[in-house]
Amino acid sequence: YRYDWARDPDAGMPLAVVRPTSTEQVQTVLRWASAHLVPVVPRGAGTGLSGGATAVDGGIVLSTEKMREITVDPVTRTAVAQPGLLNVEVKKAVAAHGLWYPPDPSSYEICSIGGNIATNAGGLCCVKYGVTTDYVLGMQVVLADGTAVRLGGPRLKDVAGLSLTKLFVGSEGTLGVVTEVTLRLLPPQPTTATVVATFESVEAATSSVVAITGKIRPSMLEFMDAVAINAV
């Protein structure tokens, strides 16, 4: 629990690792930490490559891995999920109801929804379908002093006041710990076809992308140069 996939050599030795299962338990941890001035590092699945879940000396690593409940509402096309679920687990849970959760970071089989929210993760589908923030309708989050607040809700149209929900998506766990999220879902992805093309130069490839996206919006676009292809 000292490291995420960044393997920071300067990672500290935490005072403790806690693995809560509920919002109330997260509140208890953060209240104690706030009262004793102990730093807290929220942690999802630890698959990040930027060191966001790296432990600090004398701090607490708060892992959400045990928070794994999900409820799907096919009528409103929403899901209420805890942050410890993996992205792929959310996809499977909603697919059982004939629905689809589009964000698909390359680590979708091993990364958590909580981590996706913390980093505003995208994926290849973001070209057409957007990134995590486009699918977060609301959340419950515990602030540094242990206060639990609800932001947003299950409605697409929610324009009363400032959009604090958007503020927390991509905040890397610096503003609070997300303990529950309401996700917007879509009908199943339509049948797709894959096209592979080669180009003599980067300029030719980018010009083709501009021409293609001027007529249609592909669900995915991926560019690989010779170095990347040879590495694969």
Show which residues each predicted segment covers.
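Short beta-strand "acidic-cap" motif of Rossmann-like dinucleotide-binding folds
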Residues: 40-42, 220
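FAD-binding subdomain of flavoenzyme oxidoreductases
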Residues: 69-224
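Glycine-rich beta-strand-to-loop/alpha-helix junction loops that act as flexible
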Residues: 43-47
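Pocket-edge structural micro-motifs
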Residues: 20, 42, 64, 83, ...
